[in-house]
Amino acid sequence: MVKFLKQNKAVILLQGRYAGKKAVIIKSFDDGNRDRPYGHCLVAGLKKYPSKVIRKDSAKKTAKKSRVKCFIKLVNYQHLMPTRYTLDVDLKEVATLDALQSKDKKVAALKEAKAKLEERFKTGKNRWFFTKLRF
């Protein structure tokens, strides 16, 4: 079977708290491990999408509308829908498995991931990833 759920692939979560949210695969575990004996992956995604920015907005308002909130999570392959898009954001060093072990490490990883995703949004690349999924 061809492994197509690779790193940097954009996916949509189908189950759980973040169902319908877009995420990007950071690391995939095709054969599972001792804790999770099924195929799963580490994803980072957008909890809250940036709002629409218009020309007449002030710089302060534009900065506020450009904010994103993100999440880092381990997800079963069954709960993902892959898309044709890829997102070349380097989150491999930011979000690791040991970052999920303790609260303070996770908070630090979330801040770094948020900064990288906001910077990617401000450059105007990967526009599809930063738009809310309408359904």
From Swiss-Prot:
Pfam family membership, one: Ribosomal_L27e
InterPro entries tied to this protein: Ribosomal_eL27, Ribosomal_eL27_CS, Ribosomal_eL27_KOW, Ribosomal_eL27_sf, Translation_prot_SH3-like_sf
One cellular component (GO) term of this entry: cytosolic ribosome
Family label: Belongs to the eukaryotic ribosomal protein eL27 family.
Keywords, in A-Z order: Ribonucleoprotein, Ribosomal protein
UniProt record, GO biological process: translation
Annotated GO MF terms: mRNA binding; structural constituent of ribosome
Superkingdom assignment: Eukaryota
Annotated protein name in UniProt: Large ribosomal subunit protein eL27x
